Amino acid sequence: MLARKSIIPEEYVLARIAAENLRKPRIRDRLPKARFIAKSGACNLAHKNIREQGRFLQDIFTTLVDLKWRHTLVIFTMSFLCSWLLFAIMWWLVAFAHGDIYAYMEKGTMEKSGLESAVCVTNVRSFTSAFLFSIEVQVTIGFGGRMMTEECPLAITVLILQNIVGLIINAVMLGCIFMKTAQAHRRAETLIFSRHAVIAVRNGKLCFMFRVGDLRKSMIISASVRIQVVKKTTTPEGEVVPIHQQDIPVDNPIESNNIFLVAPLIICHVIDKRSPLYDISATDLANQDLEVIVILEGVVETTGITTQARTSYIAEEIQWGHRFVSIVTEEEGVYSVDYSKFGNTVRVAAPRCSARELDEKPSILIQTLQKSELSHQNSLRKRNSMRRNNSMRRNNSIRRNNSSLMVPKVQFMTPEGNQCPSES
């Protein structure tokens, strides 16, 4: 929830509140780290003080495609309206200069008096009729009520010019709309990443892992994954580099970053000597000011357009000692994927030390696994003993209930005064 602002201005703070603030200084909360790449893949970067704004107009098509939809639709509508109005003024000026307006005012209606062949454009009596004729020419509606004659060469020139301008506007604006609807990042909306990344032991090595999946049946061809670590560093000369990017390799048996994304995959990076995570332990991870950026690229199978999906993981989103649960099962000869468990993780045994310490002391991993096995056996014993105790309590309660439901013996008195027990 958003923090509510104080109703009382700062210059009118009550004395008691001010005294409490002096006696109990507030602990300043740690500000959240600014992400370089948002979880949605958008770049969290603000461009300021750009002096040469005219460079955007030199590539006007890309500028129009990059605009928001509401701005694009406004420009789309205004471009046609402005062109219609501009040429409506030109048609009205042609009719006014040739005297067609006065001719129609004198004759009233067009008759068989030679007026039809004496005007530049028939039935252009006012600016409204000129505007309608401009729309008919540019959109090629062709109602037939207004038509151009051979009387004015200038009108023929205006007709040719309007057709050329109309074709240019149609090509640019319709191409812009098409490119916006077919942009590559639209396909990236169905490429999903796990919300958290994990660090666990795989094949005797500490590994950084995350999960990626595709919701569509149409595949991504030549899909590749790149991972970069972005953090603030300081050079030996004292220069502070706020955004230092470093590529980290992806563990792949074929020594390539290409993947076959037919089902959700767990992408693994082995933390070795080349990795920037080599000296980071579980305790150090919480205090690290780093961001792991993941970039998935590929070609859309249906359109052939190259698409790119991005996400990032900061230190708070990396879970140490967890692994992803399995979500792919085989059902009736078909592999089924349960996306409800896409980001679910379970806790596993993992050393809390860094990968460097693990390489220097391999016994740490053995001790961790032994402790995990012992704790697992103890939990199983406790669970079995609890089940045994619950079973014994249940049996005792059943016996008590059965004993309370036993039918008592009934005795009858004979006329002679003797007791005769009845058979139950």
UniProtKB/Swiss-Prot annotation:
Annotated segments matching region Disordered: 373-409
**Which GO terms are recorded in the biological process aspect for this UniProt protein?**
action potential; adaptive immune response; apoptotic process; atrioventricular node cell differentiation; blood vessel development; calcium ion transmembrane transport; CAMKK-AMPK signaling cascade; cardiac pacemaker cell differentiation
Q: Which UniProt keywords apply?
A: Ion channel, Ion transport, Membrane, Phosphoprotein, Potassium, Potassium transport, Transmembrane, Transmembrane helix, Transport, Voltage-gated channel
Q: What positions carry the motif Selectivity filter?
A: 140-145
Primary localization class, coarse = membrane
Membrane topology annotation:
Multi-pass membrane protein
- Give the ranges annotated as intramembrane: 127-138, 139-145
Q: Name one GO molecular function term.
A: sulfonylurea receptor binding
| Reaction catalysis annotation | K(+)(in) = K(+)(out)
Biased segments, Low complexity type: 387-404
List residues in topological domain: Cytoplasmic. Answer: 1-69, 177-424
Q: What is this protein called?
A: ATP-sensitive inward rectifier potassium channel 8
